[in-house]
Amino acid sequence: PGPHGIYYHASFYDLQAANHITMLPTPPEFVERELGRVLDRGVKEYWIINASNVKPHLFTLAYIAQIWQDGPTPAGAFLQSYVRRYYGPDASRAEQAFRQYYTAALHFGPHEDNVAGEQFANYPARVLISRYMHGGEGSEHELDWAAPLPTLAQQAAWYRDLCREGARRYPAPDPDAPALLQDSVLLQMDVYRRCYAGGALAAEAILDGLAGQYLTAFYKAGQAREEYLAADAALRSREHGKWQVFYANECLTDVKHTAWLLRDLMGCLRNQGDGPYFYTWQRQVLYTPAQARVVLITNMENHLDDLALYEAMKQKKL
């Protein structure tokens, strides 16, 4: 036998549950155990580490590098040394935030490494949306890896419940936190919070659509879209100095694309519930009940597009 090496993911891309713009969601103690077993077996000649980028994954990469260079290193001790070096006087607050990040991570299956990266808060939502717009109530086999359920409604309910739990686990952003924390771990937790909130609403919209409640489904799809746009805006808001436009080509998870698909879903739901003439919902939203009962053959005002109708619904607080 000759030299041996490993191929290890600090981040990865699977169109399912991977992490690309956020740190590995499994705790560093998990990495410690895995790489400890590697070293125990003498596999230390060659390590290939997959990282989609460096900036979002700096802590994970630094920890792997430490183990590679110096051998087994306790995860807790490394975290403390890392936050002292990277965050300086805010080290204690940073350590708390990192531990909160790992504690909040959502498990989607029974195994220790069935931990959801931010792609889980995006890709299953897109799969469900696409399946709904194709029509029918049968399940989507693209989700069989995690939810091999017989109907689309059951898969949507499964995803809704997980996303609700995920959104609950992550804290709202603290605008008074140190800038470096806002640029890193706090930003990543906010991305999860927003995307999970959007995923839950997207699943609710699909369930309402399957039940024929198209107007409420349309509104929830609009709310979901706003959550994903807010996640993308959070990323872009932390671009400054040499990091300008850093997230502009965020294309592997592509949070903004989830928002685009939700706009398509809004159009689909409006067609189902308000087509082919597209005036009933507008009258229902803009008019008083008495006015809405008076129907003319001709239109007296322009049709609202989907986003304008959604904004009118928000104003009416439907």
Region annotations inferred by a language model:
Residues 1-318:
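Substrate-binding groove of N-acetylhexosamine-processing glycoside hydrolases
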